[in-house]
Amino acid sequence: MGDVALTIPALLSVVESHPEIHITLITRPFFASFIPAHSRIKAVGINLENYKGLMGLRKLTKQLSNKHQIEEVIDLHNVLRSRTITSFFKLKGIKVTTFNKNRSAKKEIISHQSNEKLPHVTNQYLNTFAKAGYESKLMEGPWIKPETKPQLTEFLSQNNLNSKEAKWIGIAPFAGHEAKIWGIEKIKNLISELTAKNYSVFLFGGGNSEIEQLNDLENKENKVFSVAGKFHFHQELALMKKLNYLVCMDSSNMHFATLVGTPVVSIWGATTPLIGFYPLNNEHLMVQVSEKNKNKLTLSSYGNKESENGYDWRNEIAVKRVLELLS
């Protein structure tokens, strides 16, 4: 989901710089729902279950050609399915430009053979558009501007949160893989330190297991609120926008908070920002192990590999380091 979210600043920047073009973004239905409304950007949600196999993708290409005035295709995904679709468009004589995933460079970074940082993924997307002839400068954020609806307004009112007496800190303690997660005990300690400062704390997550754990941490008397599973996605974004900071792992929440303009303190373990998926314009708030210990990390692109040498990065990242960035 994060890679789709990071197309948003690129798409907005391109249409801002090139008023002559219209963009149709083909993606999954849920992903289409968070693309900002724009007169020259149309997000089309496609259920890929309806287009299985080679013939299914050929059918999809035909339907897209018939329904939309496609004059050019830019593949920002560069996986087998998207390459198959673009091949069908090429057969129709349509120009195709493909995103370079820098697979070799990523492999060298992950295996500790290189420390050369890749450009941010959003800038890589912009480079792809530039290669197609649409050079653009990254426009300033925020890139998503969610409105506060009655559901969120009522929640804030019921919990006496209509005004800020002290900072509002969001915490999104989970990620897609365990090896990227700082740990619930660290989160508990962080919450204790924040509530001692009279800060309000908002806990973000999703899925039954995460919701259950966050509900256990909720303490309304101390202004610790679990919002997991309580709001529609866009209202979660509206709440994120109101925060002073979001503390998170390498996860989609990291990117969405950045897109709404909230400073992000990100904690890194089994992945590395060097491959370009760090929070845009928030590099100064990244928390990592020391330079001397980075080679001890067991890294992967997705953070799905546990330590292979017994080194646990969590032990090195103290609560105090995170607190210092929130002050």
Question: Where in the sequence are the language-model features?
Answer:
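Catalytic machinery of carbohydrate-active enzymes
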Residues: 1-327
